[in-house]
Amino acid sequence: MPTYFSGFTGLSAGTATFHDRDPAHFVIGPRGMVVDTSLCYANTDRTSIGDAVFAFALEKPTGKGIASITPPAMTGTYLGPLPLYIEGPGHGAVAYVDYDFDEKKFTPVILSPGCDYDETTKVYLPSATVLDGSSGAQECAYTLADNATTGGLVKRGAKALMLYGACTYGGPTVVEAGTLTASVAGATPNGNDLVVRKGATLSLVSDLSVGALQGLGSINGGNVTCTNFVLNLVDAYASGATPLTCARKLTFADGAKVVALDPDNFETYKNGGTVALARATEDIEGTPTLVLPEGVSSAWHVYKKNGELLLTRTLGTTVVFR
């Protein structure tokens, strides 16, 4: 998964010419994207750390990408890997060929399939100009395939990342530290899974519907509806743990379930008491069902009380007749 250090490219907040440097396309491929705001400088002198501002959308791949490349037969002697030149209407494809000196054989490696390529695309292998005196480049055969997958966004670093584009990436949104601000409606895609780690914040300007919801952080600015809630028992029962907190309303969709990532720990915490999994200032609507693996006591269950979703294990009652 590639890591994007926003301050390294000048895509940080505050300069008058910031929008002149916005990329035309910012596509998140199958492996996803990490944005680390730890070194996002607020000024050109790099004397203070500021927030990162993305005025563009983080998009899912569209159209077709480069699926495979077949290099031509060897016509010279090469000393190492070579980049492949890709020309066409699309963008984002990156590939090279490894060269086996003993076997005199090329092995193509596609780092990114790119998107929006068509049959007019050309892929070229540079000729071994220095070694055999030839010039120009040799054309490679290739195949295209529909872009069916897209990764997610992981936000790291203490400073904020502000999104101003209507994003369409299809993977999970993960806020590991600091604040991720969805500054316009759609900046955080609806329907994607959402993880907000302890101490992190997702700030919204509109309501958001997500798939699986997970974490111990905070969500403010909008109502949240989730299809499922993901529970980590170790985190929930940790000393000083606080629940996922929604400043507005949290709604569990019909048929929503609570699923544990570490179900083996139900036995570990069977005497751990009641813990809050989620809290909403404007109440919680809908009641999810706790999924219990085979062999786990049905005494475990979730319920709502005073704007909280609680997990508990009901202890049996012993009646003694005298």
Explain the meaning of each model-derived region.
Residues 1-157:
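Feature for peripheral, non-core segments
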Residues 5-9, 14-16, 35-39, 152-155, ...:
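Short, T/G/N/S-enriched strand-turn elements that build extracellular solenoid repeat scaffolds
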Residues 140-146, 224, 307-312:
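Short, structured interface segments
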Residues 200-274, 282, 313:
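Extracellular beta-strand/loop-rich repeat segments of large surface/secreted proteins
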Residues 282-297:
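Glycine-rich active-site loop/lid that clamps phosphate-bearing ligands
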Residues 298-302:
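Extracellular disulfide-bonded cysteine-rich modules/repeats
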Residues 315-322:
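Enriched but not universal
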